[in-house]
């Protein structure tokens, strides 16, 4: 199915997550997101309050999305809950699963942690997205992790951070970043459970062809409450789609 420039851009969390980004670069990111009609800016929490104030000052209609325990998912649950509580200025949070527990198959601890962080976010009125970091998981681990995350009822399940170790992913026969196959698997498990959870695809999304396949794989109406696209290369895609639109008219 073909999707319009406006539709695609409305699904994007325009991301600036490199640790060396300066405040002026975050300001530029926010300006780009507003100009392109994106849903939110996805940034590190160090710039969270700045982003909220800058968006308010400029009068932009953008949400602020911050990444927490990112990209490693290595903090204890108590610390993860605390950083959620410290993020009440934001609209949304993207938090990584406790990867070590998943790889250790400590499913009891994974379930307890995810339930705790999701309920903490919900109590504070924050939209929550749980990042599964698909490239680090075997198929069996994906099936179990997706099931646990979806049953914990965050607003979204998210594919990846975009910062996964490529060599480790390769050792498991996995790609890094978002793939239509993993998005489809998430959607199928959600339907089996009876969940209307949203899906966020992130990591390595650069072209319209990728976007179209991902949205089709999700099998949902392409609205921001159902599907998100985490992208740092949004501007390139915007220009690509804009040019194609002009050529077709």
Curated annotation (Swiss-Prot):
Q: Give the protein name, as stated in the record.
A: Deoxyribose-phosphate aldolase
Q: Which GO terms describe its cellular component?
A: cytoplasm
Q: What are the catalytic residues? A: 94 (proton donor/acceptor), 158 (schiff-base intermediate with acetaldehyde), 200 (proton donor/acceptor)
| UniProt entry tagged with the keyword Magnesium | no
Q: Which domain of life is it from?
A: Archaea
Q: Which reaction does it catalyse?
A: 2-deoxy-D-ribose 5-phosphate = D-glyceraldehyde 3-phosphate + acetaldehyde
User: PANTHER family per the record?
Assistant: DEOXYRIBOSE-PHOSPHATE ALDOLASE
Biological process per Gene Ontology, one example term = 2-deoxyribose 1-phosphate catabolic process
Which pathway does the record list?
Carbohydrate degradation; 2-deoxy-D-ribose 1-phosphate degradation; D-glyceraldehyde 3-phosphate and acetaldehyde from 2-deoxy-alpha-D-ribose 1-phosphate: step 2/2
Question: For this protein, what is the EC number?
Answer: 4.1.2.4
Matching entries from InterPro entries are given as: Aldolase_TIM, DeoC, DeoC/FbaB/LacD_aldolase, DeoC_typeI
Keyword terms:
Cytoplasm, Lyase, Schiff base
The subcellular localization recorded is: Cytoplasm
A GO MF annotation of the entry reads:
deoxyribose-phosphate aldolase activity
Its principal location? cytoplasm
Organism field: Thermoplasma volcanium (strain ATCC 51530 / DSM 4299 / JCM 9571 / NBRC 15438 / GSS1)
UniProt family annotation: Belongs to the DeoC/FbaB aldolase family. DeoC type 1 subfamily.
Extract the NCBIfam families matched here: deoC
């Amino acid at each position: 199915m073909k999707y319009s420039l406006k539709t695609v851009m409305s699904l994007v969390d325009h991301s600036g997550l490199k640790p060396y980004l300066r405040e002026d670069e975050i300001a530029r990111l926010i300006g780009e997101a507003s100009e392109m009609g994106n849903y939110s800016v996805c940034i590190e929490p160090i710039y969270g309050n700045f982003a909220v104030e800058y968006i308010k000052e400029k009068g932009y209609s953008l949400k602020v999305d911050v990444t927490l325990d990112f990209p490693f998912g290595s903090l204890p649950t108590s610390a993860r809950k605390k950083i959620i509580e410290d993020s009440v200025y934001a609209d949304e949070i993207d938090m990584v699963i406790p990867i070590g527990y998943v790889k250790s198959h400590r499913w009891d601890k994974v379930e307890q942690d995810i339930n705790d962080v999701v309920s903490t976010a919900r109590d504070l009125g924050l939209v929550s997205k749980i990042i599964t970091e698909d490239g680090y998981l075997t198929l069996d681990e994906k099936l179990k992790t997706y099931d646990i995350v979806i049953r914990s009822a965050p607003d979204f399940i998210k594919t990846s951070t975009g910062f996964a170790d490529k060599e480790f992913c390769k050792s498991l026969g996995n790609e890094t970043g978002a793939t239509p196959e993993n998005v489809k698997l998430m959607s199928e498990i959600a339907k089996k459970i009876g969940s209307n959870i949203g899906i966020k695809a992130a990591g390595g999304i650069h072209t319209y062809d990728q976007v179209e396949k991902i949205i089709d794989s999700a099998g949902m109406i392409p609205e921001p409450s159902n599907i998100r696209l985490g992208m740092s290369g949004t501007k390139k895609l915007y220009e690509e789609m804009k040019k194609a639109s002009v050529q077709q008219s």
